[in-house]
Amino acid sequence: MNKVKVYLFATLRDYTGKKMIEMEIPAGMTIAGLKTQMVKDYPKLAPVQESIMAAINREYASDEQILPLDAEIAFFPPVSGG
Protein backbone atom coordinates (compact mmCIF):
# COMPACT_ATOMS: atom_id res chain seq x y z
CA MET A 1 0.00 0.00 0.00
CA ASN A 2 1.05 3.55 -0.73
CA LYS A 3 0.16 6.66 1.25
CA VAL A 4 -0.91 9.82 -0.58
CA LYS A 5 -2.14 13.21 0.55
CA VAL A 6 -5.14 14.55 -1.34
CA TYR A 7 -5.68 18.31 -1.10
CA LEU A 8 -9.16 19.59 -1.96
CA PHE A 9 -10.06 23.04 -3.21
CA ALA A 10 -13.16 25.20 -3.67
CA THR A 11 -16.47 23.31 -3.81
CA LEU A 12 -14.73 19.96 -3.29
CA ARG A 13 -13.98 21.08 0.26
CA ASP A 14 -17.67 21.81 0.71
CA TYR A 15 -18.65 18.34 -0.53
CA THR A 16 -16.20 16.55 1.79
CA GLY A 17 -15.88 18.95 4.71
CA LYS A 18 -12.10 18.54 4.50
CA LYS A 19 -9.11 20.46 3.14
CA MET A 20 -6.80 17.44 3.04
CA ILE A 21 -7.27 13.69 3.21
CA GLU A 22 -4.55 11.08 3.72
CA MET A 23 -5.30 7.80 1.97
CA GLU A 24 -3.71 4.38 1.62
CA ILE A 25 -3.90 3.24 -2.00
CA PRO A 26 -2.63 0.18 -3.87
CA ALA A 27 0.47 0.44 -6.06
CA GLY A 28 -0.37 1.30 -9.65
CA MET A 29 -3.55 3.25 -8.87
CA THR A 30 -4.43 5.96 -11.38
CA ILE A 31 -6.02 9.36 -10.86
CA ALA A 32 -9.29 7.86 -12.16
CA GLY A 33 -9.07 5.07 -9.59
CA LEU A 34 -8.42 7.58 -6.83
CA LYS A 35 -11.45 9.62 -7.90
CA THR A 36 -13.58 6.47 -7.76
CA GLN A 37 -12.29 5.68 -4.27
CA MET A 38 -12.98 9.26 -3.16
CA VAL A 39 -16.58 8.98 -4.36
CA LYS A 40 -17.00 5.75 -2.36
CA ASP A 41 -15.72 7.54 0.74
CA TYR A 42 -17.49 10.86 0.02
CA PRO A 43 -20.65 10.16 -2.05
CA LYS A 44 -21.44 13.89 -2.42
CA LEU A 45 -18.56 14.02 -4.94
CA ALA A 46 -20.39 11.70 -7.36
CA PRO A 47 -22.09 14.42 -9.45
CA VAL A 48 -18.77 16.17 -10.12
CA GLN A 49 -16.46 13.13 -10.35
CA GLU A 50 -15.94 13.36 -14.12
CA SER A 51 -15.13 17.08 -14.05
CA ILE A 52 -12.62 17.03 -11.17
CA MET A 53 -9.21 18.21 -12.32
CA ALA A 54 -6.04 16.84 -10.73
CA ALA A 55 -2.41 17.67 -10.14
CA ILE A 56 0.35 15.37 -8.90
CA ASN A 57 3.14 17.11 -7.00
CA ARG A 58 1.96 20.47 -8.39
CA GLU A 59 1.77 19.42 -12.06
CA TYR A 60 -1.49 18.82 -13.93
CA ALA A 61 -2.27 15.14 -14.39
CA SER A 62 -4.60 13.12 -16.61
CA ASP A 63 -6.99 10.47 -15.31
CA GLU A 64 -4.74 7.73 -16.73
CA GLN A 65 -1.63 8.85 -14.86
CA ILE A 66 -0.35 6.40 -12.22
CA LEU A 67 0.18 7.84 -8.75
CA PRO A 68 3.81 7.80 -7.57
CA LEU A 69 4.87 6.84 -4.04
CA ASP A 70 4.15 9.44 -1.34
CA ALA A 71 2.54 11.80 -3.84
CA GLU A 72 0.72 15.01 -3.04
CA ILE A 73 -2.46 15.11 -5.08
CA ALA A 74 -4.61 18.19 -5.60
CA PHE A 75 -8.22 17.90 -6.73
CA PHE A 76 -10.12 20.98 -7.83
CA PRO A 77 -13.15 21.85 -9.91
CA PRO A 78 -12.67 23.17 -13.45
CA VAL A 79 -11.44 26.75 -13.46
CA SER A 80 -12.95 29.40 -15.69
CA GLY A 81 -12.60 33.11 -15.86
CA GLY A 82 -13.95 36.06 -17.65
Identify the residue ranges that each predicted region occupies.
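Ubiquitin-like/PB1-type beta-grasp interaction modules and other compact soluble beta-rich domains
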Residues: 1-81
